[in-house]
């Protein structure tokens, strides 16, 4: 299971996504408009695109849990 945080930026700072493991250690940090590249760069496997679609659908400012096996 991983934890996903979607952070709303400001006028000068873009929106970001954080992906954290079960211990809430940071696994990935990338811009919200570059999800596919951010996942690849951080070696997070998303062959079916479920994680990418989940990130796009969640609102900003809350922590969400994502089970990679579902």
Model-identified regions with their sequence ranges:
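N-terminal acidic leader/helix
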Residues: 1-42
């Amino acid at each position: 299971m991983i934890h996903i945080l979607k952070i709303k930026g400001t006028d000068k700072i873009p929106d970001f996504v954080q992906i954290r493991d079960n211990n809430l250690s940071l696994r990935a940090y990338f811009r919200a408009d570059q999800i596919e590249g951010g996942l690849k760069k951080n070696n997070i496997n998303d062959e079916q695109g479920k994680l990418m679609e989940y990130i796009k659908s969640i609102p900003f400012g809350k922590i969400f849990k994502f089970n990679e096996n579902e």
